[in-house]
Amino acid sequence: MAKRRSRGDGGLHWDEKRQRWIATANLGFDPSGKRIVKRGSGKTKTEAKNKLKEVLRDHEDGLAIAPTGYTVADAVNDWLAYGLAGRDQRTVENCTHLSQKHVIPGLGARKLRDLSAEDVDRWLAAKAQTLSTRSLQAVHSCLNRAVKRAMARDKVKRNVVELCSVPQGQPGRPSKALTFAQAEAVLNAAEGTSMHAYIVVALLTGARTEELRALTWDHVFLKGSPDVEPPQPPHIAVWRSVRRGGDTKTRKSRRTLALPARCVEVLWQHFEDQGWERLAAGDKWEEHGLVFSSAVGKPLDATNVRRAFRQALKDANGINADEWTPRELRHSFVSLLSDRGVPLEEISRLVGHSGTAVTEEVYRKQIRPVIQTGAVVMDGIFKRGPAR
């Protein structure tokens, strides 16, 4: 005779339709009076009872467990839809791109509750064969934040992604700078193009692309203030960027930069050209007061600038336009100043860095430091010329 199950052990029966054993446990009633029943299924009695034990353990841990079919893709899509509210549009687009191209294809079909640290390690190791370390960190961050959000909403008990370190990836695209001869070739090739003024100002002031795209005419002073004491030369006030809220990258990025004569000349011409564009556009013109805008006054995005920049460089001698980006004009600015012996502290101020350490780290390939203070002082002390 079969042994009778103890009170509270729940039930166990064969489901003919599903062809599985179903183990059930009655946990009382919820606040609305509805009976709370937990179930576990399996091909054998033991498997069904073990599955029920897992469900009961999760319930005792206080977890409102997600449906068993809840996948990594579900968690990532939920995070993209609701977890990025209030973020900059560029951030949302970047996270969406990384998630849809790398996270979901690799791990999306995996059930979230079954995702293990080993799964994540293998996925990262595979991605390390093609992605740079920085890109690996970005895709790991997307997955980590998605699972963390799912855990906060009781979809999973723990976040295994946090247990996984990011491996070393492939070397990223190295930064580079124009030589003086290349810079001259770029400036000459840009003449007569819509990007001429942009390229001249970017190369000769070192302003960031995000700062130039947000530059407005009321922050451009082409005549300066010669009558004040001390006199102010022509300058631009770099106080805004296209970042969310219009703030510059850091507090010290807010700076006022004197304009070289070549910049003043091209900006006067650009101001006149933009006036003709405004007349040609007529009612289609959108007035934003931007120095650098589309043919109808609209703000430029990074893709617009990069495409037009490469188009302007296509006839530059010794330059493969497809290998260069607008941000490398800033690298070139640093390199040209360093070649002329401008102190690192001064370069750091001009590019809007919070300190020289940042400049050395970001532009270490462009900086050519020669620490000569000690040699100069010692020469003055001992007054001995070089041996002949």
From Swiss-Prot:
Record Gene3D superfamilies: 1.10.150.130, Intergrase catalytic core (1.10.443.10)
Function: Required for integration of pSAM2.
Residues annotated as domain Tyr recombinase: 173-379
Gene Ontology MF terms in the entry: DNA binding
Family to which the UniProt record says this protein belongs: Belongs to the 'phage' integrase family.
Signal sequence, start to end: none
PROSITE patterns: CB, TYR_RECOMBINASE
One record GO biological process: establishment of integrated proviral latency
Name of the protein in question: Integrase
InterPro entries found in the cross-reference section: CB, DNA_brk_join_enz, Integrase-like_cat_sf, Integrase_catalytic, Integrase_recombinase_N, Phage_Integrase
Active site: 208, 249, 330, 353, 363 (o-(3'-phospho-dna)-tyrosine intermediate)
Superkingdom, taxonomy of origin: Bacteria
Entry keyword annotation includes DNA-binding: yes
Domain Core-binding (CB): 70-151
Record's keyword terms, sorted: DNA integration, DNA recombination, DNA-binding, Plasmid, Viral genome integration, Virus entry into host cell
